[in-house]
Amino acid sequence: TLLTPWLLEWYGPHVAFGVPGVLMAIATLMFWLGRNEYIHVPPGGLAFLREVFSRDGLLTILRLSLVYLCIAVFWALFDQTSSAWVLQAEDMNLRWLGIDWLPSQIQVLNPILVMVMIPLFQFLIYPLLSRVVRLTPLRKIGIGLFVMAAGFGLSAMVQGWIDGGTRPSVAWQFLAYVVITAAEIMVSITGLEFSYSQAPKTMKSVIMAVWLLSVSLGNYVTAVVNHWIQVPGINAVVARAADLEPTPEGIETTLADWELRVADLVPRADWRTQQDDATVREIRLSGPDGRFATADDILLSFNRFGGLTGVVTPDDEPLAAAKEKIDAAFFVSADNDAAKEIPADEAGDALVAGIVDSSGRPVRYQRITRDRYRLTTDGPDGQPFTGDDVVLQATAVRADPEEAARLADKPLSWREKRLIELKGEEGRREVEAARGEAPKTRIDGATTVGGLATLEGADYYWFWTGCMLAAAVAFVPIAVFYRGRPHLQDDPTVA
């Protein structure tokens, strides 16, 4: 967890994923070498099926499945530490304890905290809690679910600060990791032990499989929610742009619900001879009217690598006018570039008031982070959060002499070198900007169509916090009315 992000940053994916592959091969070899030292339980045959489908076996699966449904929500939140929390860390101050952390490296705290906190729980926290209430496995799990809600609620608060234009320290994520690791100890470790003890002798492996199914279910729920909140857009067309064949004059094709026409400005055989920023292909998308060469068309331009170089929409002019007003407010907000602020939502709305899109509807403004904001129009269909929304994403690139001086002696990482190699001078400017070496502070803008999310920012985190809290409350009656009995591995009364 600590080494892989560092290897990826400095040596590239070949080494970053090759090293874990070699280590896994060594681990597999060690496992194989000890094959004669393990206990081998012979297949149970029909006795296994009889116990699984017996009244006791079916009731055990049913009772534990109710427990696992609530725990699945725990996993839906916990496994987002490797996705949503990494994205959150990108907008935080990553210099902590004198170290420049990579966003994905903060995950290393979890296994370290697990090793530190297990003895703490075993010898201090559990004995103290036992003086107040009798701690059963189900009560530990229930407490852990509420603690998980608190941990994710903390991350929601942090995201709220980010949405408000601040750049909090990544130390706040450390605190959140402490909380959710405590929840993991009470839910995951206790849940595994409880599941094993509740499973009849021949069903230990089956119950472990059902336990792992709850992990899978939690991740599936996360995937479904993230798919559900995603608004379609032109990304599906952009991803396939280089693979599409040119369409004959007056003929269109369909891709991801878009009617489109593909035209090569340069024969494909000559693409490699063109400059990196030269437009070699154009794709025209028809708007809601379903016709081409009308006011609601969208024109996409691509370079020889299939990279998107330009987007022309009916709302480019009002969006540019709105961006000009927001940018002006940013530059006059402070003398020091590091202190300049993107306007808050209310102030931004006031600045763009009166600017309307091609259909006469107002342009919407939203501050995303300290350095990013978004301008949106409803597009030709007049409906928000649809695939026709025209979106201008703006990013402030700050000149930061102090940061540039601090990183002056730091060599270029593999990722930075690769970025320069792939994008040329544009990539070099991106690397210099990230190091604070931009000649002057500027605000870059990029236009796209669709692709918004109906749930984002702090609202996204609060949604999952609410789900976890609801699951924790639902678990209380399950724990109260749960009736099961432990089955020991060497229980002579169990067939």
Feature annotation, model-predicted:
Residues 201-210:
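Loop-to-transmembrane helix entry/capping segments in MFS-fold secondary transporters
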Residues 157-158, 164-186:
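Hydrophobic core of transmembrane alpha-helices in multi-pass small-molecule transporters
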Residues 4-108, 116-137, 150, 159-160, ...:
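Intracellular loop-helix junctions on the cytosolic face of multi-pass helical membrane proteins
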Residues 185-199:
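Intracellular juxtamembrane helix-capping segments at the cytosolic ends
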Residues 1-10, 156, 216-232:
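A gly/Pro-rich, aromatic-decorated transmembrane alpha-helix motif that marks the paired
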Residues 108, 112, 146, 178, ...:
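Transmembrane alpha-helical cores of Major Facilitator Superfamily
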Residues 136-154:
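Structural signature of the two symmetry-related core transmembrane helices
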Residues 248-442:
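Low-complexity, acidic interaction segments enriched in glycine
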